[in-house]
A protein has these predicted regions:
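Negatively charged, low-complexity tracts enriched in Asp/Glu with abundant Ser/Thr
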Residues: 1-65
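N-terminal soluble domains immediately following signal/targeting peptides that reside
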Residues: 43, 48-51, 69-70, 96, ...
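Aromatic- and glycine-enriched beta-alpha-beta binding-site module
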Residues: 58-98
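Ampiphathic alpha-helical segments that act as solvent-exposed interaction surfaces
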Residues: 94-128
Length: 128
């Protein structure tokens, strides 16, 4: 990554990735917990990705929760719909799969799967 202060810019990187994969909306990122240290190549971070239309009106239906962490030195992203806890969850590590949010078992991808998979791949390409 080519950032002078990456810990302050990861939120911007995630927001810009969401902007590109969920046009025409604008996104902001709020850190919930965790840290990101590029020098240690370690990450354990949870953020909310908040969506707005071009006029600035909140669109909570598109809000997401994103968890980023390393597992066996591999970057893993878990994306869920923030305000819809019963919707499937995207697990994007070495493999990408969709999980039932109630029991954690593999399930079919939802209609909107490509949008979230594209977001995960874009973020991974910046951080991996």
């Amino acid at each position: 990554m080519l950032f002078e202060n990456p810990s302050k810019n990861i939120e911007s990187l995630i927001a810009k990735s969401a902007d590109l994969t969920n046009k025409p909306f604008v996104h902001s990122v709020v850190k919930i917990n965790g840290e990101y240290e590029i020098e240690e190549e370690d990450i354990d971070l949870t953020v909310n990705i908040l969506c707005r239309d071009k006029e600035g009106k909140r669109l909570e239906i598109y809000d997401l929760e994103l968890e980023l962490f390393k597992s066996n030195k591999e970057l893993v992203l878990v994306i869920s719909k923030l305000n819809f806890p019963d919707e499937p969850i995207l697990w994007c590590g070495v493999k990408t799969l969709w999980m039932n949010s109630n029991n954690g078992k593999k399930c079919n991808s939802p209609k909107y799967s490509s949008r979230l998979e594209n977001l995960a791949n874009r973020i991974k390409s910046f951080l991996d």
